[in-house]
Amino acid sequence: MRIWGKIMKSNRMLWDMTVTEDSDDTRTHKIFHALEVICHARDLSVPIWLDTNVRDFQQYKKTRFGQDSFVGEQIEFDFLEFQILEE
């Protein structure tokens, strides 16, 4: 599974990273681990999954985490987009 995380601000990509998850974990564990890896690389707290994030991810294999998902942390960008590239 390949997962892409990118940080966007004012319709411009500031940073991106691709994570490859080849472990025998469940799909859900791979997704959560990839999000942790991406956030750790940028020294961010791991965002919480709101209902809209879960719904978008289930439907489109992509979601955006905005300021409301980063509890107790002020972010310097508009959103973190998280997307499955290949399963």
What role is predicted for each listed range?
Residues M13-A41:
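Short, flexible N-terminal segments of the mature chain
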Residues M8, T26, F57-Y60:
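General helical secondary-structure elements
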Residues A34-E87:
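Acidic, low-complexity intrinsically disordered segments
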Residues S10, D22, L85-E87:
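Generic structural motif
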Residues M1-T18:
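Short, extreme N-terminal segment that most often corresponds to the first beta-strand
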